[in-house]
Amino acid sequence: MKQCLSVMRWQFGTWLGSARTVTAFLVFEPFIYNSSTRHIATLMFLGLMLLFADAPFTEQSAMYSLVRCSRVQWVVGKLMYILLSCAVYYIFSLAVTVLFFSPNAFAGNVWSAPFYELVMRDAAASSYHITVDPKLFMPVVTPYLAAFYALALNLGYGFFCGSLLFLINLSGSRVLGFAVLSAQHIISYLIRFKYLPFFISVFSNHGFSEDAGLPSVGFSCAYFCLFAAIIVACILRAVRHVDLKITVGTRI
């Protein structure tokens, strides 16, 4: 047992000189990594859908507000709630990652050496199956700007999903809304990895060597804004023809 404990102490002693132990990350890099990793992004998506599970929020206590405002004002208020909820959700996620890693991280606007190696080298991907994509963003984007882009794109995608769920649930069943949202999320990954024809989406990720052909962040944000405007217009049109009830048998 004495020899076993000696081996264990020696192994712990190697931590002091290991670059994996003492090399710090930038505080925003975990959030950037989470936003670009498929399984973590999907878990965040599921959490957001759970937040909007009761869309279009027509419970009895909330429906009394229709007595004091028009249907258009009611819809605008609900959409403002969805947008602000998305902002709180993703800002909270950013804050949690920053606080969790802050004891062993720095705040400078420069990429850390470990994260740079994970992104730019193939050794981590081949040995540990850890990948961060796309590779081309790191040389041209600062960490602070990358964190802002990740937050903005998450917010755009979250509002798109929340407003689409609101529209579908307003006109149909909640099961249909979740089915449509889940299908579009899965299809987006199939398109990204070439399981569907490229012409279906301009966002097809067709390999690291061709990442330069992907749309810019500005174009992606404009795309989200366009689809959000279309969905909002459809909601404003649909709400005029939907039966909204405060109590059973009472139509507003």
Q: Which residues does each PLM region occupy?
A:
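Hydrophobic alpha-helical transmembrane segments
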Residues: M1-P56, F148, L170-S171, V175, ...
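Active-site micro-motifs of SAM-dependent methyltransferase domains
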Residues: T14, M63, Y81
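Secretory targeting signals
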Residues: A24-A55, L79-F166, L170, F203-C225
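Transmembrane helix boundary and interhelical loop/hinge segments in multi-pass membrane proteins
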Residues: L51-V67
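Membrane-helix interface segments
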Residues: S70-V72, G172-F178
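Amphipathic cytosolic juxtamembrane alpha-helices at the membrane-cytosol interface
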Residues: S70-Y81
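Residue-level recognition of transmembrane alpha-helices
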Residues: K78, L181-S182
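Hydrophobic alpha-helical transmembrane segments of polytopic
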Residues: C86, V180-L181
